[in-house]
Amino acid sequence: MAPTPELSPETLARHLAVLGPASGYCVAYSGGLDSTVLLHLMAALSAARELPLRAVHIHHGLQPQADAWAEHCRQQAAALGVDCLVLPVEVRRDSGEGLEAAARQARYAALASHLQSGEALLTAHHADDQAETVLLHLLRGSGPRGLAGMRAQRPLGRGRLLRPLLPWPRERLRAYGDTHALCWVEDPSNAHVAHDRNWLRHTLWPVLTQRWPDASRRVGRAAGEQAEAEALLRELAGEDLARHPPGPGLAVSVLARLSPARARNLVRHWLLMSGLRPPPRARLEQGLADLIRAGRDRQPVLTWPEGELRRYRDRIHRLPAGGPPPWPGPDREWDLRVPLVVPGVGVLRLVRADEGIAPSLIGAEGLSVGRRRRGERCQLAHDPGHRPLSKRFQEAGIPPWERDRVPILRRGEEVVAIANLGTAKRFTARPGYRLICEEHGPDGG
């Protein structure tokens, strides 16, 4: 392996160029050694190349020294000629994921919300951090995605998250800090070996580096191989997804033709595409097999803390944990003039059509939108007579858990239209408007 270059503003600039351009840079500045070194390097780059630069310090309020750390960051950034914004965040202690994970979630949410368009957020993760991450994932039994460790870049908010210090080990950062007489704070919680990462850092890592001094580079190289394998699996999942017939969710008939490993790979990446973290391997293996083997008249459910998979007929649907939100409250008045947002359901709008809702209804009084009512019936444009809405939903293949969320447009007590299904005969004109609902949900298409 080629030796790691010296850590300097020039080498950092070359590495940033590989990661791509940005409209400006924002350093996530905790006040510790790593982010202090990064801010010092970026301040030198900013002065030499007139790069827009600012810093953000997240005030978690979890340590007695939190206020002092925030003031330290303001002063150190000011000494470098960099504006530093202090953002207080509230860390949920009842999240069920542990205090460290909750703090990380709150931190990134705050950083993402304050990132400007095209701006790059820089974090100071280095090669030793990457090695620790990979080893922790290995001990948790993770697959290629976890063993790939932290990505050098990813989308975040309106910009990107960059980790430009990943090529350099911790010792290089400390040497840089000592050489430039930098001042940083020490978080006492980093010494608590009750945390897995701290135990690995203070207990196991010194033993590994005594035997293999370049252990972080070796683990980093392995992470790169795993990242490539994960990219290939993602590409394969994309090809398998493209073979699915149109419609929401995944087709059971297509999944059943794949090997179990390939089917799990497709489902895993399909969930990640929607922002849902997949279930653990054993849960996914058994649950997906049950979903595929179930008869068409069955409605099995695979649940895990982050979401659900449900089967209806030949499709598997992804849903948030606990299922979709119910219809929000009573009927809503709507005069059809502008789109209507129904929280948790979607956006209702009219689109021109050869046949549909009569234009004379736009702006009319007495119009409202709500969910179906018990025993409700209607006659759509080409029906011979009135039929129950429940029967229509079943024929349209609408899953049972969605039927109470289908928007129904009424005038008084009469059904005018059913979103995405049709217009009542009595209110139909040529030309007219179709009532459509563009869904918000994770399985909106």
UniProtKB/Swiss-Prot annotation:
tRNA processing in keyword set: yes
Subcellular location: Cytoplasm
Keyword tRNA processing: yes
Swiss-Prot/TrEMBL catalytic activity: cytidine(34) in tRNA(Ile2) + L-lysine + ATP = lysidine(34) in tRNA(Ile2) + AMP + diphosphate + H(+)
InterPro entries assigned: Lysidine-tRNA-synth_C, Rossmann-like_a/b/a_fold, TilS/TtcA_N, tRNA_Ile_lys_synt, tRNA_Ile_lys_synt_N, tRNA_Ile_lys_synt_subst-bd
Positions that bind ATP: 30-35
UniProt-listed SUPFAM superfamilies: Adenine nucleotide alpha hydrolases-like (SSF52402), MesJ substrate recognition domain-like (SSF82829), PheT/TilS domain (SSF56037)
Disulfide bonds listed in the record: none
Family under the similarity heading: Belongs to the tRNA(Ile)-lysidine synthase family.
Protein name as catalogued: tRNA(Ile)-lysidine synthase
Origin species: Alkalilimnicola ehrlichii (strain ATCC BAA-1101 / DSM 17681 / MLHE-1)
